[in-house]
């Protein structure tokens, strides 16, 4: 039962942050990024937000811009999530795409 609630809150965090990017944020660098997935701690107080953007060369700039806009995201989550304590957000770049590309290159090199 708790895992269902955790998964639901993770999905709500993704939805709310992406909605905030569209409606509330005016920084063009933040608009380049999007949330790929969220990992919420067991106590629901810390969330690691994995970010991705279409231009992989600007990913660190996007992560820094998200860290600067963290207050807006935290305020939106506090208003819309019904939790005892506000969620602390930690923004990191999502390495899943880079790892998948490396694996694909290795597989292609083995085929040849």
From Swiss-Prot:
Any one Gene Ontology BP term: maturation of SSU-rRNA
A single Gene Ontology CC term: cytosol
Top-level taxon in the UniProt lineage: Bacteria
Keyword Lipid biosynthesis included in the entry's annotation: no
Keyword tags: Cytoplasm, Ribosome biogenesis
PROSITE patterns from the UniProt entry: RBFA
Any one GO molecular-function label of the UniProt entry: ribosomal small subunit binding
Protein localization: Cytoplasm
Entry annotated with the keyword Signal: no
NCBIfam families named in the record: rbfA
UniProt similarity note: Belongs to the RbfA family.
HAMAP family, per database record: RbfA
Description of how the protein assembles with itself and partners: Monomer. Binds 30S ribosomal subunits, but not 50S ribosomal subunits or 70S ribosomes.
Described function: One of several proteins that assist in the late maturation steps of the functional core of the 30S ribosomal subunit. Associates with free 30S ribosomal subunits (but not with 30S subunits that are part of 70S ribosomes or polysomes). Required for efficient processing of 16S rRNA. May interact with the 5'-terminal helix region of 16S rRNA.
Protein name: Ribosome-binding factor A
Natural source organism: Mycoplasma genitalium (strain ATCC 33530 / DSM 19775 / NCTC 10195 / G37)
């Amino acid at each position: 039962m708790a895992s269902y609630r955790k998964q639901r809150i993770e999905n709500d965090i993704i939805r709310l942050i992406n909605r905030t990017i569209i409606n509330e944020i005016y920084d063009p660098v933040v608009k380049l990024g999007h949330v790929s997935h969220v990992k919420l701690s067991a106590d629901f107080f810390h969330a690691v937000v994995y970010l991705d953007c279409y231009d992989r060369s600007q990913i660190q700039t996007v992560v820094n811009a998200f860290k600067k806009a963290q207050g807006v995201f935290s305020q939106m989550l506090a208003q819309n999530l019904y939790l005892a304590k506000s969620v602390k957000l930690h923004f990191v770049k999502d390495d899943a795409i880079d790892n998948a590309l490396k694996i694909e290159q290795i597989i292609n090199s083995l085929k040849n």
